[in-house]
UniProtKB/Swiss-Prot annotation:
Self-association and partners: Probably associates with SCF (SKP1-CUL1-F-box protein) complex through interaction with SKP1. Interacts with S100A6. Interacts with HSP90.
Entry keyword Ubl conjugation: yes
This protein's name: Protein SGT1 homolog
CS domain boundaries: 169-258
Family from the record: Belongs to the SGT1 family.
GO BP terms in the entry: kinetochore assembly; regulation of protein stability; skeletal muscle satellite cell proliferation; spindle organization
CDD domains: p23_CS_hSgt1_like (cd06489)
Pfam families to which the protein is assigned, alphabetical: CS (PF04969), SGS (PF05002), TPR_16 (PF13432)
Reported modifications of this chain: Phosphorylated at Ser-281 and Ser-331, dephosphorylation promotes nuclear translocation, most likely due to disruption of the SUGT1-HSP90 complex.
Record comment regarding domains: The CS domain mediates interaction with HSP90.
Domain of life: Eukaryota
Length: 365
């Protein structure tokens, strides 16, 4: 009975104020009571703001930022909610968003310069981990709750993360090749979602921004050697790479991909390079020529026995007319491979019977 009375008293105390001090004492209990309070008053901006604080103390930053945003929707001038939104973004390592939030909050709070976020918030301001329950009584100074302090921390964190991103970006490679009508750039980035890729084309510039699976941003900006047609240029996101196709206005061969201020002499595609495999490598190979050499070798190769006979049939079929090919196909299929005729006027009128060689017997399996 006494326990029930104590619980009722605690509930009434929370409902009366939901102050930071009371929340500091028992964040989980405060969270439950605030949730009940919001069921009765779903449009109370302060309740959302204080519930965000409960979630912050419990380390639930993703949920906390949602409550802080809801509080700001209901009361855009609530700088405490702005501060708590920024704290969540900071601890989720979304430093750019946190910096923007703190800067906006500083404008709202220009008169006072700081806000109290609760006695248990000290460790949250200085650590990426939620505080232990036995340390929630630590005090917080005005400096720790100052928007300016948070802005500085975000800037320092951004500078550190940018250097890490630069190191990571330096490991990302891209390659390019060209055809007569387009230049194709391949970014060697795996497992990227299409919504996380933004590519912008201009006449002589390409800009690509990719949100990597790690959460970092990859930037590629190229000043192109020759003009392109932006509206006909496209990109495709695949599981193993990102493929960017730049449309050429004319069949000009690019000597290199980038050109900074230089005016290159256009070189037209000519017949002797038409069937070269497109590549940025200085070494090229004419595949038509290679195929021709292989065919010539096969033609001059001396075969014996069945191999020579098969070569003869292949040559007859390759050089034959449509009627010859039809006759060979029909006779071979209907006779079970025992007859091969080139006379369509004969085999076209009848079914070709099975006729094995004299020393062999036909068996059906």
């Amino acid at each position: 009975m006494a326990a029930a009375a104590a619980g009722t008293a605690t509930s009434q105390r929370f409902f009366q104020s939901f102050s930071d001090a009371l929340i500091d004492e028992d964040p989980q209990a405060a969270l439950e009571e605030l949730t009940k309070a919001l069921e009765q008053k779903p449009d109370d901006a302060q309740y959302y703001c204080q519930r965000a604080y409960c979630h912050i103390l419990l380390g639930n930053y993703c949920v906390a930022v949602a409550d802080a945003k809801k509080s700001l929707e209901l009361n855009p001038n609530n700088s405490t909610a702005m501060l708590r939104k920024g704290i969540c973004e900071y601890h989720e390592k979304n430093y750019a968003a946190a910096l923007e939030t703190f800067t906006e909050g500083q404008k709202l709070d220009i008169e006072t310069g700081f806000h109290r976020v609760g006695q248990a918030g000290l460790q949250l301001l200085t650590s990426s981990d939620p505080p232990a329950l036995d340390s929630q009584s630590a005090g917080i100074t005005g400096a720790d709750a100052n928007f300016s302090v948070w802005i500085k921390r975000c800037q320092e964190a951004q500078n550190g993360s940018e250097s890490e991103v630069w190191t990571h970006q330096s490991k990302i490679k891209y390659d390019w090749y060209q055809t007569e009508s387009q230049v194709v750039i391949t970014l060697m980035i795996k497992n990227v979602q299409k919504n996380d890729v933004n590519v912008e084309f201009s006449e002589k510039e390409l800009s690509a921004l990719v949100k990597l699976p790690s959460g970092e941003d990859y930037n590629l900006k190229l000043e192109l050697l020759h003009p392109i047609i932006p509206e006909q240029s496209t990109f495709k996101v695949l599981s193993t790479k990102i493929e960017i196709k730049l449309k050429k206005p004319e069949a000009v061969r690019w000597e290199k991909l980038e050109g900074q201020g230089d005016v290159p002499t256009p070189k037209q595609f000519v017949a002797d390079v038409k069937n070269l495999y497109p590549s940025s490598s200085p070494y090229t190979r004419n595949w038509d020529k290679l195929v021709g050499e292989i065919k010539e070798e096969e033609k001059n190769e001396k075969l014996e026995g069945d191999a020579a006979l098969n070569r003869l049939f292949q040559q007859i079929y390759s050089d034959g007319s449509d009627e010859v090919k039809r006759a060979m196909n029909k006779s071979f299929m209907e006779s079970g491979g025992t007859v091969l005729s080139t006379n369509w006027s004969d085999v076209g009128k009848r079914k070709v019977e099975i006729n094995p060689p004299d020393d062999m017997e036909w068996k059906k399996y």
